Amino acid sequence: MPRGEVDMEAQAESALKGSVRLGSYLRRLRVGYGYSLRRVEERAKAEGGEIDNSQLSRYEKGICYPSFDKLRVLASVFNVSVQAFSDVVDLEACEVLKAQGAEPKALVDEGNAAMKAGAYRQAFAYYDFALDQLHSDDSFPNAQDAMTQTRINLAVALSRLGKLALAEQELRHALRASNTLSPTLVARAFLALSNIHADQGDLLLSEVEADKALNLAKAAGLNLLAARALQTLGRVLAQNKEHSAAIDRYREAVTLYETCGEQFETVRVRINVGDCYVALGKMKEGVRLIRSALADARTAGYRRLEAQAWSNLGEAHFRAGETDQAQSCLRQSDALAGSPEKYPDILFFNAYYEWKMAGNQGNPTREKIAFGRLKALRSSLERRLPEVEAFDAFVERRRSDG
């Protein structure tokens, strides 16, 4: 059964009433298209489904859940994925994290701090509440720009949570008014889109969008945004296995980050540079750089980056045939990535290399446990990691052979 169907049915079974968040999302989609309730009913019929306007009204009010078949029809009407609906319901758990009584700017500042701490659900809740306030009261200074800025931040938080379809939708919504937006906001939106498309494996589109963001940032003298665009271009090059060129881009980014006093991204880029050196066969230098970045991430309290650095060290030792060191590093990463907020992509990465090592050592019990973890984590990943693609290919081969 598809993950979206499982999630929606689980939600329907766990509550007698519907989802207020899903209802609000459906209403935003309908209003965004300029559709009346009756018009949605007509479009549903054109898509081969049946949703009368009274049903949709109940869905929007959070009175009841749509069936999975109804969600399929609504997804076609509004040109979104069923997965997006599932993700919206999943995010309902973030409602309890919303702060009360704060101004939008303070909420956004809290969200930014939560992002750096790796608390992505908390960050999402702050941004979402700030966006609600800005929507309900346009008397705030520069309300339109503030709304777009917050929407971009919200999209970045969604992408960190693995909700790529929802994140992309928020960014495309932000860019609808690109003619009236400042170069800073347009560049930020394109850069966020670029990273989402890199996560999805569309490296050509990602490169085009990052280049556009870089040109806008340079023209406006926005060094921090230019650094982020260079970092994304380095990422695209690394994913294309052009590691030497990626290092050059990363170093340009670090130079700009340091002039801006941006420590968090500097640490992230240093991890990536170390990873590139390992990929080039320069193990000693790569490990040195990653360990140096790891120490700074730990000191600064950047839990996500610390977990990432341990994972990259684990992979480096695995490729060098140093199994004990690899396992030790991956365990350190698991401890950080498993709580208080889980990072499924890092946990999957770690489980993949545990699975490979168990197979190499002829340990069927450990291999089976790691494989079970991979299967459990796979359903929560939209991001197209090389390890995800290798695992999917293995599963498909086994299915074909069976």
Provide a role label for each language-model segment.
Residues 2-35:
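A short, Lys/Arg-rich alpha-helix, primarily the initiator
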Residues 105-120, 146-162, 185-201, 224-241, ...:
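Tandem amphipathic alpha-helical repeat scaffolds
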